[in-house]
């Protein structure tokens, strides 16, 4: 499936999602409009129940809307069936999850190769291995390709997950709370990888409830009550954190993050 290089990578219009439980209807999304251009780094925020997880599932082709349109990389995926959405997912989206989702008895390089097997790309085993090792090198894991997950730290396991998401060269990286299981220092290092990938031209969509993590993006979309409540550029994205050097004693303090608006906490939103 081909797409126009001039088309936005994500184009959502009047998107609604209604869940029906017996006679009860729950309106999770109520007419969302959202455009993400190629090469953007967008953080989507919102408290529990805001609709951000539903929006993520639709962006990731894990679910489809009740009404409205969603074009991914120029392709209208709004009404595709499950098998068609699976094909689009494998081709267009690289997922990174909070829980890493690595196969415990499989080496790092083999974990990264999995999407190449599912994608039916026709690659030989040596070609898959080469692409896997290149992806691991790209996220700073050269020399650890043959390690099992149990031999890697949490941050290193998440790097493997990012490499796995990258290996098919997807249109977007979709990261769902990728630092949720990491300490603050390791979180900074992992988010720095996303910044590096974005600087190299990769489109990144990050789902998070943490303002400190969203501050690394270049744009923040805040979802509330099933609608896009705020959609603003960040004046100055938070600086990358090379090896967490700024957190070490004697290191320079990081500059304050300049938001063009105040990001409300979940507690403030639900009041």
PLM regions: where:
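ABC-family P-loop ATPase nucleotide-binding domain
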Residues: 1-18, 233-271
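ABC family nucleotide-binding domain
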Residues: 8-217, 222-223
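H-loop (His-switch) and adjacent beta-strand-loop-beta switch element
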Residues: 220-233
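Flexible, glycine-rich phosphate/dinucleotide-binding loops
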Residues: 213, 229, 237-238
